[in-house]
Amino acid sequence: MRIGASDLDVCRMGLGGNVFGWTADESTSFEVLDAYLHAGGNLIDTADGYSYWAPGNSGGESETVIGSWLASRPARDRIVLATKVSTKPDRPGLSTDNIRLALE
Protein backbone atom coordinates (compact mmCIF):
# COMPACT_ATOMS: atom_id res chain seq x y z
CA MET A 1 0.00 0.00 0.00
CA ARG A 2 1.51 3.32 -1.04
CA ILE A 3 1.57 6.15 1.50
CA GLY A 4 0.21 9.30 -0.13
CA ALA A 5 2.31 10.59 -3.00
CA SER A 6 5.52 9.20 -1.48
CA ASP A 7 7.49 6.25 -2.76
CA LEU A 8 6.91 4.40 0.53
CA ASP A 9 5.19 1.08 0.00
CA VAL A 10 4.03 -0.56 3.23
CA CYS A 11 2.07 -3.66 4.12
CA ARG A 12 -1.49 -3.16 5.33
CA MET A 13 -0.76 -4.35 8.85
CA GLY A 14 1.87 -2.44 10.78
CA LEU A 15 3.53 -3.71 13.94
CA GLY A 16 3.11 -1.60 17.06
CA GLY A 17 6.21 -1.49 19.23
CA ASN A 18 4.78 -0.17 22.47
CA VAL A 19 5.59 -3.36 24.41
CA PHE A 20 9.23 -3.64 23.30
CA GLY A 21 11.54 -3.04 26.25
CA TRP A 22 8.61 -3.17 28.66
CA THR A 23 6.40 -6.27 28.78
CA ALA A 24 8.48 -7.87 26.03
CA ASP A 25 12.20 -8.04 26.83
CA GLU A 26 14.81 -7.60 24.11
CA SER A 27 14.99 -11.30 23.23
CA THR A 28 11.21 -11.65 22.90
CA SER A 29 11.01 -8.37 21.01
CA PHE A 30 13.63 -9.58 18.53
CA GLU A 31 11.64 -12.80 18.00
CA VAL A 32 8.46 -10.82 17.30
CA LEU A 33 10.28 -8.45 14.93
CA ASP A 34 11.93 -11.37 13.10
CA ALA A 35 8.59 -13.16 12.71
CA TYR A 36 6.90 -9.99 11.44
CA LEU A 37 9.65 -9.39 8.88
CA HIS A 38 9.61 -13.05 7.82
CA ALA A 39 5.82 -12.85 7.30
CA GLY A 40 6.30 -9.93 4.91
CA GLY A 41 5.71 -7.06 7.30
CA ASN A 42 7.64 -3.84 6.82
CA LEU A 43 5.92 -1.06 8.83
CA ILE A 44 6.99 -0.72 12.47
CA ASP A 45 5.50 1.93 14.74
CA THR A 46 7.05 3.29 17.93
CA ALA A 47 7.25 6.48 19.99
CA ASP A 48 9.82 8.15 22.20
CA GLY A 49 7.48 7.99 25.18
CA TYR A 50 6.71 4.28 25.03
CA SER A 51 6.90 2.75 28.48
CA TYR A 52 7.89 5.83 30.47
CA TRP A 53 4.95 4.83 32.67
CA ALA A 54 6.52 1.52 33.69
CA PRO A 55 8.59 1.44 36.88
CA GLY A 56 12.28 1.83 36.06
CA ASN A 57 11.68 3.08 32.52
CA SER A 58 12.06 6.64 31.25
CA GLY A 59 10.66 6.36 27.72
CA GLY A 60 12.44 5.47 24.52
CA GLU A 61 12.84 1.81 25.44
CA SER A 62 10.89 0.68 22.37
CA GLU A 63 12.99 2.84 20.05
CA THR A 64 16.17 1.49 21.65
CA VAL A 65 15.11 -2.15 21.20
CA ILE A 66 14.04 -1.57 17.59
CA GLY A 67 17.31 0.26 16.90
CA SER A 68 19.33 -2.65 18.32
CA TRP A 69 17.32 -5.10 16.25
CA LEU A 70 17.85 -3.08 13.06
CA ALA A 71 21.59 -2.81 13.78
CA SER A 72 21.85 -6.59 14.16
CA ARG A 73 19.91 -7.52 11.02
CA PRO A 74 20.48 -6.82 7.32
CA ALA A 75 16.92 -5.52 7.04
CA ARG A 76 17.07 -1.74 7.36
CA ASP A 77 16.36 -1.15 3.67
CA ARG A 78 13.18 -3.28 3.97
CA ILE A 79 11.68 -1.52 6.99
CA VAL A 80 9.60 1.66 7.18
CA LEU A 81 9.90 3.00 10.72
CA ALA A 82 7.22 5.34 12.04
CA THR A 83 7.61 7.22 15.30
CA LYS A 84 5.84 9.97 17.16
CA VAL A 85 6.67 12.77 19.56
CA SER A 86 5.21 12.05 22.97
CA THR A 87 4.42 14.18 25.92
CA LYS A 88 5.68 13.02 29.29
CA PRO A 89 5.23 14.52 32.75
CA ASP A 90 8.59 16.28 32.47
CA ARG A 91 8.05 17.22 28.79
CA PRO A 92 4.45 18.35 28.31
CA GLY A 93 2.96 19.54 25.05
CA LEU A 94 4.37 19.88 21.58
CA SER A 95 6.67 22.83 22.04
CA THR A 96 9.74 23.23 19.86
CA ASP A 97 11.90 22.21 22.82
CA ASN A 98 9.90 19.02 23.42
CA ILE A 99 10.07 18.03 19.75
CA ARG A 100 13.82 18.68 19.69
CA LEU A 101 14.33 16.55 22.83
CA ALA A 102 12.20 13.76 21.37
CA LEU A 103 14.35 13.68 18.24
CA GLU A 104 17.51 13.29 20.27
Indicate where each model-derived feature is located.
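N-terminal binding-site loop/beta-alpha segment at the start of enzyme catalytic domains
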Residues: M1-V80
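A short, structured active-site edge motif that brings together acidic residues
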Residues: D77-P89
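Glycine/proline-rich, positively charged
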Residues: T87-E104
